[in-house]
Structure formats: structure tokens, C-alpha cells
Amino acid sequence: DLFAVDTWPGFGGRAVLIIIEGWFLGAEPQLDSELETAVNALEENEDGEGLWRGYANAQLGGSYQRWFAYIDHLILLKAPAFKQVKSWRSLQEVKLAARSKRSGSSRGIMNGEQLERFLEHFERLTRHCLQSLPGKADQVFYLDADHQVANHHVIKNAPA
């Protein structure tokens, strides 16, 4: 993300390993009944009828599942709770602000209110993933509040 596409290094040949990272990688859609109740103020005030929740869930159950089917080995870095995800994302914003201050650009830095609103967009699926993905992942690294691995559970060994 930080470099122009024309500066990216090229790769030739056949990859042995491709690592893909994402908040909702491997997530499955929620049951319709789980979408009925808003999980935060954003959903309550701006998606009271659940139209966005339903749309996002339908997308997650469609083309994303076809893409996720290509994953040979799913590894989950599991935060202790959504509260910790919020705290870590806040810390990330503080570090970004400090780096931006040094470079003289504060473009894209969120204040506390903006960050809270940003996180509300992802709260439902983050909570869902924290609950459901440990039962689906091939390996789970349980992180503590300080980002350290507190436990590691292997369900399926990585392909050779």
C-alpha cells in the first residue's frame, strides 16, 4: 500500500507459499436470525431495517466463499475480545499519527470519534469471526492483550 505499483518487485516462477491477510478471511455468513438485532449505534441508527447487514452477509455467503475455497491452510490470529481489537486499532492510529507528524502530513488520521465510527462498521463481523473462526481455522494463535501468543492450537498441519 505504501509504495507506487511501478516500484513493486516482480516475481517469476511458481510460488510455494502465498500469504493473504485480512480481517474477515475465511469468515462465513451469519444466520439470518443473527442479523435481526443491531450490535451498535451505527446499525441501530443507520441500518435499522438491516438492509446493509443483509447485503453484506449475502456477499460474504456468495463470491467470498468461492474465493475462500482456494485457501489450503487457514491460520487465525485471535484477539482476546472485540474490546482488544478496538484498543489495538486505536494504538495503530496513534502510531500512524506520530509517523505522519514526522513527515508533515496528517492526511487520513482519525480522531477518537472517527475511529469509533469506523470500527462500528466492522464490529458485527469481527465479533462473529472471533466466535466462529477458531472452529474453522487449521491453526489458531490465541493472542493476549499485549499481542503475545498465549496459546497455539493446531487442528490440521500445513500442507508440505
For each predicted feature, which ranges?
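Phosphate-binding/switch loop-helix module in NTP-utilizing enzymes
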Residues: 1-28
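Conserved NTP phosphate-binding and transfer environment spanning the P-loop NTPase/kinase superfamily
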Residues: 24-160
